[in-house]
């Protein structure tokens, strides 16, 4: 069965969620809850370097979190997407919309 591991870290001006595994309709609920909560209080960075795949459920969380960030004056960042994660993001046509970074030092 697919799993999604989430590790949380906090920086001065961001919350980092390191994700590993598969983001799918079977695994996304904990990620969704954390993303929707944390974007209300701080900038949110999701590290996708260890993500094996993302389905439409996961992409929907990205879009909603991005929009919530705009509404609250916070920024949603995607950091180091794996090839599989980047392909899924590219498939949406919103690649240029997301803030894709390589390091948390790029968080403003």
Predicted segments — roles?
Residues 1-52, 66-108:
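STAS-like cytosolic regulatory interaction modules
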């Amino acid at each position: 069965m697919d799993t999604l591991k989430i590790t949380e870290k906090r920086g001065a001006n961001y919350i980092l969620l390191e994700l590993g595994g598969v983001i799918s309709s079977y695994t996304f609920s904990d990620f969704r809850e954390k993303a929707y909560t944390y974007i209300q209080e701080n900038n949110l960075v999701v590290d996708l370097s260890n993500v094996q795949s993302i389905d439409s459920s996961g992409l929907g969380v990205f879009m909603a979190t991005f929009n919530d960030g705009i509404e609250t004056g916070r920024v949603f960042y995607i950091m180091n997407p794996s090839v599989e994660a980047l392909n899924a993001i590219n498939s949406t046509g919103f690649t240029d919309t997301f803030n894709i970074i390589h390091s948390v030092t790029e968080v403003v």
